[in-house]
Every structure is written in structure tokens, then in C-alpha cells.
């Protein structure tokens, strides 16, 4: 089968850091769609897992653990001007890697804003704090070298889904052909469409033929990443339409210049809320802290004098059932001794990953969901030996990679500054059933206002997610 080559790299190297749950799929997509000699790709990983996949594709695999003490010297010997660094690791500082890339005029891409482990730094930083730290470094970064942060599935593709969803809702009200170019223009559309909330809505129903053991931790993507999110206090973008929450629910509230933030006195695994996906309709998921909740909210917010508009933006996630059981077991163990881990892959019998944006509006029960519904069978046809989740993340990586190669002089950027039409053009063939769905929100049963829903859960905290 002949694949489209979106970009050509001559005499340039790609270095990939980390080769766990997503790396193999991302590598295959790069080999398919980037015109590059496999000898110009190197993988650095602190584990020899998946080494055979790299070597079977004639890719150099280096088993090495990067640390704050050695990363600069080690990578400086590997990288030269105009090369590309793709960071798919956990607990390797994104800021430090970007600083090095900027100094060496190397393009940078990652899927998550990572920090060095708390055992090294002495502190654990949360999702919002890591983003703030990154933004504070912006003035220290060169505007001449692109560094695209947080561009996988979510964060990443979900921002482009959000833009398309908001345009679809606007066009359902008043057919306007123009596409916004500035944050104020996007905010105008959202406000004029009476949008009060954007749910990042994901439900994973992939089921393994292998039963989870009592002391085993299972997931369809990074187990460490899932547990880090589940054990963090819930934080998200708090819309201007929301009422105050009772003081006992709130840990922190910030009215920033660009975004209103709220942090709850509960960790994510203890906090549930309703959302909607096409296959199930209404479902209960965990309210997970995710960086795109803040960046998407900023895209659709605006402030003129004392008048401010911002929708609530949060991530409602229903992991696969084995992952839910694993999270609860890990919490009962105090999130320590997470030794026996298993990623679901060829053992998956059935199921899909539905990932999209749910648009909720004031004064109407009509809701609109736009996104990807990728079944495990189609995922395997697209990229063998992968699952639906890894394919969605991997195509986010490829589309981000193509964009930074085509736009090499943009400085530090988040997905909101990326051309969403270009990304969706590249990603769509790998997203399964891709498009929008209209439905009705049954408000008589489930509060549409996030604050009302959270109060209902807080004072009636039965475990609904199953």
C-alpha cells in the first residue's frame, strides 16, 4: 500500500525519547508518512521494552536513562542544527529539553508537559502549575525555533476537534463560511452561540481476553500517566456562568488574566460527573486534570473592560474497566508498589475508544459531540499490534510533527496555535468514525451546569463509575 509522504527530511535526524505504549505506533506512522532514511532515526529509552520493534525497522535503539545531570551532554552529542527531538517520555523535564533544543536550533515536539520526578526535585508539580512554569519561560525561548508542546490525542487533537465543533454549532445557527484566526474571534463565536461548557469527553470500552490479576495494574496507555492524573486534585477551567461552590469543596480559585481556574478538595478518582458519547449516550466518568482544559478555555475566552466570557472546560474520562479496577486498587495501596503492569494490546477482544468534544449551550437541551470513534478492529487494520487509544495518540504525534517541519520558526506553541484544518487533514484517515452527532441533554436527570453537578456528587459520593 502506498502512503502519502507529507514532508521530506534530507540530512536531518529525528531523536525519539521514550518508546513505551505510544512509541511503536508513532514510529510506524513516521516511517509511512515522512520521507526519511530509517538510519536517520534514533530512539533513546530507559527500558529495553519494544527494542525489537525498533531494530526490525532498522532503527537504532539506545538503552540509556536521561537525568538532570546527564541529559544536556548526552543529547548534545546526538543532535545538530535543524534536527527534531520528539519527547514521548515520562518524568523528563519538557522545559529543560526545550531549552536545549532552542540553544541548538532543534525542533521539538511532545505529548505531555513533563517534569523531573519528585524524588529528584523534592516537589510534585500539578498540571496547572507545570503549564504556568512553561509559559513563564516563553520570553526565554527563541521565536525562531518551533517547540510544539502537548500534541498527542488529548491534549492535542482534541483542540482541533473543539474548533471544528464550535464552527459546526455556529453554522447550525447561522451559516457563516469564514474561519476565525484570533482567540477573540473564536471567543466571539462561542459566546454568540451561547456555549457554556465544553466537555473533553472520552469513553474507553476495550476489553481483554486475559483476566486482570489481583495485584496487576492494567491500562490501554501509560499506567504511570493514568495514576498520576487520578491521584492529582481536580482542576479545570471555571466558566463565567458558574455559581460559587461551597467553601469545603474548593482548594483553590484563580481568576487569571486569561483563564478562570478552580481546584477542588478531591482527587480525580474520587470525583465523578456526567457527560455524553454517541455509543452510550449519558455516562459517568472521572473528572481528570488535563492541561488542554486550560488552553482550550483561553482560546474561547475574552475580556472587555469588566465584561468577561469563558466557558467551563473539563475532561470527563471513563477508562476501560480493567483500568478502573487498577486505579482503585492502586489508591487502596497508597499509590505505591505499582510493580506488575500490563498494557492491553493483542489480547483485546472488542471495544473502542470514543474521544471528542461535547458542546453544551444555555437555554437549549441540544448538545453536539464531535470527535473520533475508533474500534479495536479498525485500529489493528490501521496499525497492527496496537489498540484504539495508541492509534489516536500516535496520529496526533504525526500531525504535530508534520506541522512543526512545515512551520519551523514559530517559537513555543500549544495546539491552539496550530492550523486545525491541516492537522485534521492528516489525522482523519486514522480516526475511525469521525464526525459530529447531535443529541438532547436530559437535564431533568443530570444537571447541565457543572457546578450543580459537582455539588450533587460531592454530597452524594456513591461510586457510580463501573
Locations of the language-model features?
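NAD(P)-binding Rossmann-fold cofactor-contacting core
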Residues: 35-55
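Rossmann-fold cofactor-recognition segment
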Residues: 56-69
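Conserved N-terminal Rossmann-fold NAD(P)-binding element of oxidoreductases
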Residues: 15-20
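Hydrophobic/small residue at the entry helix of a nucleotide-binding pocket
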Residues: 22-25
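A short, basic/flexible loop-to-alpha-helix module at the beginning of a structural domain
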Residues: 1-11
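Rossmann-fold NAD(P)-binding glycine/threonine-rich loop
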Residues: 95-106, 111-145
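Conserved Rossmann-fold cofactor-binding substructure of NAD(P)-dependent oxidoreductases
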Residues: 66-79
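C-terminal catalytic/substrate-binding lobe primarily of soluble NAD(P)-dependent oxidoreductases
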Residues: 168-466
